[in-house]
Amino acid sequence: MENLPKSERLRGRSAVSALMSKGRWGFSHGLKYCYLRKDPPEGVNRIMVSVPKRFFKRAVKRNLLKRRLREAYRTQKELLGPSSIDVLFLYNSKEVLDFLSIKEEVASVLKKISDEG
C-alpha cells in the first residue's frame, strides 16, 4: 500500500478555514464532502479526511475509516484530473462500511465534483 504524498494533503489553518467557509458542500450516501476550486490553479489536488468522534468513540475505528477513505481517494484520484481542487471528506455513516463500499462512494463524489467544474 502506497502513501498519499504530503503535497496532496490539505493542512494548515488558513487553507482548512477557507475550504470550510468558501467551499461548496454536498452529500452522498455515507459521505459529506466540501470542495473548493483554487484560482489560479496550482496543479495539485489536496484532500482532508475526518471521521467524527460522535459516531465512533474508539480511535481504532476512526483511524480504520480514515485509512480506507484515503486509500479509496488515492486509487481513484485521476477522476478529478489536474484541476487544483481542495476536498474534505467527512464520514457520515454510523456503521463501519467495507472498503469497496467506501471506494464506490468516493468515486461517485469525485465524479460529481469533476462534472460540476
Model-found features: residue ranges?
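Positively charged, solvent-exposed patches that mediate nucleic-acid binding
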Residues: 1-117
